[in-house]
Amino acid sequence: MADSPGTEDGGAGCSGWFVVEAVVDKQTGDAVSEDEDEEDIEDSGFDMIDFIDNSVVAEEHVELSNAQALLHVQQTCADAADLCELKRKYISPYVSPIQYSEPSIDGDLSPRLHAIRLGGGQKAKRRLFQRVEQRDSGYGYSEVETTERQVETEHGGPEDTVGGSGRVTTDEAEAVEVVEDGSHVIDHCSPRTQLIELFKCKDLNAKLYGKFKELYGVGFGDLVRQFKSDKSTCTDWVYAVFGVNPTIAEGFHTLLKRQALYLHTQWTSCKWGMVLLALCRYKVGKNRETVVRQLSKMLNVPDNQILVQPPKLQSPPAALFWFRAGMGNGSEVSGTTPEWIAKQTMLEHSFADTQFSLTDMVQWAYDNGHTDECEIAYYYAQRADVDANAAAFLKSNNQAKYVRDCASMCKHYRLAEMRRMSMAEWIKHRGEKCDEGDWKPIVKLLRYQHIDIIVFLAALKKWLQGIPKKNCICIVGPPDTGKSCFGMSLMHFMQGTIISYVNSCSHFWLQSLADAKVAMLDDVTAACWGYMDTHMRNLLDGNPTSIDRKHKPLAVIKCPPLLLTSNINITQDSKYQYLQSRVQVFEFPNPFPFDSNGNAVYELNDANWNSFFKRLASSLELQTPGDEDGESSQAPRFVPGTVVRTV
């Protein structure tokens, strides 16, 4: 039976689908023979072949013929890509050092710039440079060399992706200035990039000190002295601030000069931005923490970009640096120049340098009553602003030796002066150094303690004269009756010495009696009474005796008038019978009175004791020859004079 040109069966016999499968044996892409009739092809159902995708090669078509296998492969690739992104986001070792820095002022002025900030992961950086480098698998197997760089916006701030999508917008990509020429990449670094590299330094202060010397030609340490503590206060401060925004720098001097007596500022530009160097004298003293906090807020910079130290006050090169810098056009100066700059830069001051004179220093210490080494050193150094000899003392390298010599000479002068005076002259000399008070509180206290004033004055007169057997007075009584207060106030007025039985184990515990006008032994106990009964009978008599002195030979002295206080009344104990004739005893039986505010009812001070001795000078026989003649003694002078030498 001849083949029919078409199919009339309803799909039971040969069909168009059967014809397609029959033609599968032919190679795909073979050209159709021209001998075949186009009409036969259309009738055979070959017009349906356009429904099959022949764009894939035969091998791939065979492998992906299974639709479920293709879906599995696509899901696996998608999961691997997501896992790679997560690894790059959370396992990246790179952490930006700027992420914790304070925001720039540009971020406060522009919301769009505020949204652009540097992230902590490497994910955004790789996404940002996917145009200039090939994307690898994320496992480091790619052989393509890539370059990782920090990218910045046109405003100098670091750029990062915003949101969680990790995509870079078109506007942000336009802000990146990157030109790739083969393997060489050109990047235009802004001041913010330089600060990022600065923060990566291990020793930030060393980097800042080096940059300062590069900009100004002098080390920061040459202009300042070091304060180890941040709590130390000072009125003068030198500070250098790095990476300041130029818009803030314009009004800084105007804002700060309201708080300062003197302000010297100069700005310098570098690759890190604007650098500020300033010398400021505040109206009140400030510590370093306060100054750093103030500058950080005013200039909008982190604390670690600020160097703050007090200036060198005794350095002529440092003073000359500020003097010359203030004369230039690059500095802005307001206020009165500090005296330490003016004195070290004036020609008159340089020519007027004098040689130190120990005699002038000794005379000053004697006139002001300084005998302690610490007081002499401290107060004389403060006179360097008004005394040329004190300024020469500060410039000397032998300050400690001069202080020791000065204190030693003052003690010798004072001791000789005291020994030359009689007791009446000494009391008058001490009274001239204090004000006039009221003698009545002392008399009222003695009456309050039931002491006969006439008997007490008679004993006090003999005590001051140092009459043998009358050279020691003891005040006894219960605790809190005012015995020590009464005795200590008298010793303070007469500048007497205090000895203590606690030092009795030393051979030199009585050495201070050799250089005293009067002396006091407070709170004599039973053991001390026993020691005095055994070893100090001759001393209590007021007769000459010998005492041991440290690093000196034995000295024969007459014991000065000695005042004792004790809770033990030796007149009521027979075992102290040998001391009863040597000690005059007065008893304080009543507690010392105080008012409702806790103040003493009977005030005992130098002014009241001065009035007491002046009032009762005739009864105590304290009249001096100078009082009768009306002569006034002049203060001694210990300075070299002009001696006329004759031929």
From Swiss-Prot:
Residues 146-158 have a biased composition (Basic and acidic residues). The keyword S-adenosyl-L-methionine does not apply. One of its GO terms (molecular function) is DNA helicase activity. GO terms for biological process: DNA replication. It comes from the Viruses. Its EC number is 5.6.2.4. It is found in: Host nucleus. The modification Phosphoserine is found at residues 92, 96, 110. Residues 451-601 form the SF3 helicase domain. Residues 187-353 are annotated as: DNA-binding region. ATP binds at residues 477-484. InterPro entries: Helicase_SF3_DNA-vir, P-loop_NTPase, PPV_DNA_helicase_E1_C, PPV_DNA_helicase_E1_N, PPV_E1_DBD, PPV_E1_DBD_sf, Rep_E1_papillomaV, Znf_lg_T-Ag_D1_dom_sf. A motif (Nuclear export signal) lies at residues 109-118. The keyword Nucleus does not apply. GO terms for cellular component: host cell nucleus. There is a cross-link at residue 558 (Glycyl lysine isopeptide (Lys-Gly) (interchain with G-Cter in SUMO)). It catalyses: Couples ATP hydrolysis with the unwinding of duplex DNA by translocating in the 3'-5' direction; ATP + H2O = ADP + phosphate + H(+). Phosphorylated. Belongs to the papillomaviridae E1 protein family. Can form hexamers. Interacts with E2 protein; this interaction increases E1 DNA binding specificity. Interacts with host DNA polymerase subunit POLA2. Interacts with host single stranded DNA-binding protein RPA1. Interacts with host TOP1; this interaction stimulates the enzymatic activity of TOP1. This is Replication protein E1. It comes from Human papillomavirus 40. The lineage of its organism: Viruses, Monodnaviria, Shotokuvirae, Cossaviricota, Papovaviricetes.
